[in-house]
């Protein structure tokens, strides 16, 4: 079973204290000390609970309590301690001898708050009111700035393309894109230890020579009226051949070039 509430007993006085009750409490504590606040009221002859006797003694009847208004030095000390400790009034009262936590709290709410507001200082944050209150325009600017920073990213650099198989280029890089390679059959590296055109260049040149020889043969046939059995070659020399379509001439042209 827990403790029974001290103020729910029958025949307990509640409300303001009378002078006679104050005198009884002071006389008992001076003679016997504070002791146990739960058993003190019955020993002192008071119809009060222990909590009420303790608060009456601590806040009003102690002999070391200061009477009168707070001084300017006490005001500045309370402001400084409040900026460090916040609303911990019991700790603040421990730094001010003769002042109670309840007295300091009431004095803060009735006097010091107004003094700070008149100076343009927020009593909760102890900062200037202009700095603590943010205007709607500044909030809008912050939102726009944040959106701009979130959605704007760095420009991606373009991939570097380097050609492979250039004759006059002496330097090459190891990184190329997929478009540079193309098909596997399109690029064939010439690994022979010789200086000359690449395989692609040679094959292209052979095709162009064969096409030119073929066009020349057809033009000669039409000009001299030759039949299919006789072919006229005007590439290197003029002569008649047997249904060979100037094959030897084309091969010799490719080799000489």
Swiss-Prot record:
Protein location: Nucleus
Disulfide pattern: none
Keyword annotations: DNA-binding, Nucleus, Repeat, Transcription, Transcription regulation
UniProt motif (Required for interaction with CPL1) ranges: 189-193
Domain HTH myb-type: 9-61, 62-116
UniProt tissue specificity: Expressed in roots, stems, leaves, flowers and siliques.
DNA-binding interval(s): 37-61, 89-112
InterPro entries named in the record: Homeodomain-like_sf, Myb_dom, Myb_TF_plants, SANT/Myb
GO cellular component, one term: nucleus
Protein induction: By nitrogen, salicylic acid, NaCl and abscisic acid (ABA).
GO biological process: cinnamic acid biosynthetic process; negative regulation of metabolic process; response to wounding
Domain of life (superkingdom): Eukaryota
CDD domains: SANT (cd00167)
Molecular function per GO: DNA-binding transcription factor activity; transcription cis-regulatory region binding
Assembly information from the UniProt record: Interacts with CPL1.
Name of the protein: Transcription factor MYB3
The organism's taxonomic lineage, starting at the top: Eukaryota, Viridiplantae, Streptophyta, Embryophyta, Tracheophyta
């Amino acid at each position: 079973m827990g403790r029974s509430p001290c103020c729910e007993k029958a025949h307990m006085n509640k409300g303001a204290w009378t002078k006679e009750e104050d005198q009884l409490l002071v006389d008992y504590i001076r003679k016997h000390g504070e002791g146990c606040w739960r058993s003190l009221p019955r020993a002192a002859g008071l119809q009060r609970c222990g909590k009420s006797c303790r608060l009456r003694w601590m806040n009003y009847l102690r002999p070391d309590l200061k009477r009168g208004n707070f001084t300017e030095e006490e005001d500045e000390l309370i402001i400084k301690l409040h900026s460090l400790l916040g609303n911990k009034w019991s700790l603040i009262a421990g730094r001010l001898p003769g002042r109670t936590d309840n007295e300091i709290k009431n004095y803060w709410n009735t006097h010091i708050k107004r003094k700070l507001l008149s100076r343009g200082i927020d009593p909760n944050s102890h900062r200037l009111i202009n700095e603590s209150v943010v205007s709607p325009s500044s909030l809008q600017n912050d939102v726009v700035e944040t959106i701009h920073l979130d959605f704007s990213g760095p420009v991606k650099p373009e991939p570097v393309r380097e050609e492979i198989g250039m004759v006059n280029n002496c330097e090459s890089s190891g990184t190329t894109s997929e478009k540079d390679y193309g098909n596997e059959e399109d690029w064939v590296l010439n690994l022979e230890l010789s200086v000359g055109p690449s395989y692609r260049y040679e094959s292209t040149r052979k095709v162009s020579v064969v096409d030119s020889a073929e066009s020349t043969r057809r033009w000669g046939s039409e000009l001299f009226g030759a039949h299919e059995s006789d072919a006229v070659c005007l590439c290197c020399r003029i002569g008649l051949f047997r249904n060979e379509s100037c094959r030897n001439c084309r091969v010799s042209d490719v080799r000489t070039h």
